[in-house]
């Protein structure tokens, strides 16, 4: 099973994935956790470039870097893990690119979606389920403000992050069979309980 966790800045994806992984391991599942950009040596190298506020990368170059990292990530880590029977949980995937670069970033939702869905061939490589940790942009940014160092996207203005939130919710509305929206203001364990019910329904 391939699980993706999406959400805006400060939604608590890292804590959610850690807690969800722990519960699934306790149920006897083998879990591989990963993230984007990252998840492989190429992805980790690209991550540094993409998140560095000092790097002045054009929007189209940024998009192509995300896609290059994802193509390698899928082939090198995700597909082998799935073929070996493991459950993969990824912190971000296609829809983060569609929302951040396509919708909030202005490159166009359909244009970016088409590129994402053909990153490893003619057939889209999609997750079995997506958990969207939904949080108001202002609340998420307040959480992030407690950190000492913010990356390029975390430093963007609130209007950008509001567009990100609206973009994710719009995608979730279009694909209710794959998307499950969770309230990121709830305690993490409460969200994990809801997620486990959805995962068990798919098994």
From Swiss-Prot:
NCBIfam families, A to Z: DTMP_kinase (TIGR00041)
Statement: the UniProt record of this protein carries the keyword Zinc: no
Instruction: List the keywords (alphabetical).
Output: ATP-binding, Kinase, Nucleotide biosynthesis, Nucleotide-binding, Transferase
Q: State the HAMAP family in the record.
A: Thymidylate_kinase
Q: What is this protein called?
A: Thymidylate kinase
| Coiled-coil intervals, chain numbering | none
The record, for InterPro entries, names: P-loop_NTPase, Thymidylate_kin-like_dom, Thymidylate_kin_CS, Thymidylate_kinase
Underlying gene: tmk
Is the Kinase keyword given for this protein?
yes
Organism, by scientific name, is Chlamydia trachomatis serovar L2 (strain ATCC VR-902B / DSM 19102 / 434/Bu)
What is one GO cellular-component annotation here? cytosol
What are the recorded Gene Ontology BP terms?
dTDP biosynthetic process; dTTP biosynthetic process; dUDP biosynthetic process
Q: Which reaction does it catalyse?
A: dTMP + ATP = dTDP + ADP
